[in-house]
Amino acid sequence: AHLIAPTHRLLDAASDQAKGKAKIGSTLKGIGPTYMDKTGRNGLRVGDLTSGKFEERYQALRTKHLGLLAQYSDFEYDLESVESEWLSAAKELGQLQLIDTEHFLNEALDAGKRVLAEGAQGPMLDIDFGTYPFVTSSNTIAAGACNGLGVGPGRIGEVIGIFKAYCTRVGSGPFPTELLDETGE
């Protein structure tokens, strides 16, 4: 699992602010910038917490992010106000028992145990099948669980879809059932 650093959240906010009226309505949790580092193969992972090189990797990522933030001249931020608390939490997280969930889950399935996976969001927010660019950074469809958990698709026995009686959306983007008249108010 990848870690969302304080600078990821700052990059998310800076990018959103710079887009002005064209912004897509990010949740500002740093998820998009974290996925950018994941696909760029320079992100921080939970396993890095116990690697002995966490501080070095964090500082390299921090330096990269500060360089990117410098491009947003109108964006003001205070990294130090959240960084020490985040580093403390990261240290505490690194002291927990960390396991390889891919092996753990597959061993459980091999032993005949039932595994329940829960996902969030819906197909219209899926990075590949959703209303791009107004999507999240991950696969939100049932197949995304296989990728995220390290479980082969042939191991899934049953998928149960749950939906709300009414649609909602965070941010902007297409909303086919939105009522723009008095009823929608």
Predicted regions span which residues?
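Non-transmembrane, aqueous-exposed alpha-helical and coiled segments at domain scale
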Residues: A1-E185
